[in-house]
């Protein structure tokens, strides 16, 4: 509350046509709460990318459902899909409970739940048992589950292919086996998706995706994309896929638009993309 950095963040969100709501937390002086920030080197050529997160005293750790009107959001406004990130669920015990309560409220009101596992090793250290229980409950309530091979193995204990493996195009079937295991473990979900990323160099990746929708499989074979900054590609995929679902397109287009949105995000130095229109995204797919 009253922080110029908070004001900057609010203005930045507004510039992207994103609304927010939540309690304004008193900073508590110079040594109180603050906003986390990332120090990121995108890399170039032979220099690989590196990221450092500074989260000491992060105000986001205080998220609490008491500060959000869940009845209004789910009961009156009729949210169609609520998206949860494993990064937030693992940030602190408070945010883990926050995500659980959001999932429970969404399930109660018949709102679809999307859950991107987003494993972060530093968040899980010495908290594996606690977080595994939280992630299992959220995943059990979810309609859409997203994660790469490492996420499914470390967050949910679903055996899969080697993380960061090579020759992904030749190992599509091993990813399908992993997704089938996830389908058996979490039968409520009807959409499972994973991205495929093979690093050729800092500025060139092989990028693909696999999605199971009911009994149907949709695969985008890995193909080379130019990369300015890899950060945000996975989130771009999820955002594009959810957008396509909300638009009511055929399932085949969900994964195509998601793939293209992720590819678009890697052409920006920011960790998100702001496409001018749908055509700009589709032009990347085509």
Residue locations for each model-derived region?
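Conserved N-terminal subdomain of the carbohydrate kinase-like
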Residues: 1-86, 281-286
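Hydrophobic beta-strand scaffold residues
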Residues: 20, 113-115, 146
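Charged helix-capping and loop-helix junction motifs
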Residues: 68, 96-101, 127-136
